[in-house]
């Protein structure tokens, strides 16, 4: 699940 979040640009921006 975390991997998918990293792939998403929106979530990646949150990191």
UniProtKB/Swiss-Prot annotation:
Origin superkingdom: Eukaryota
Subcellular localization: Secreted
Recorded GO CC terms: extracellular region
Tissue expr: Expressed by the venom gland.
Transmembrane regions listed in the UniProt entry: none
First-listed, main subcellular location of the protein, grouped into a coarse class: secreted
Gene Ontology MF annotations: toxin activity
Keywords carried by this UniProt record: Neurotoxin, Secreted, Toxin
Family membership noted in the UniProt record: Belongs to the scolopendra toxin 9 family.
Protein name: Scolopendra 10564.33 Da toxin
Organism: Scolopendra viridicornis nigra (Brazilian giant centipede)
């Amino acid at each position: 699940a975390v991997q998918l979040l990293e792939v998403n640009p929106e979530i990646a921006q949150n990191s």
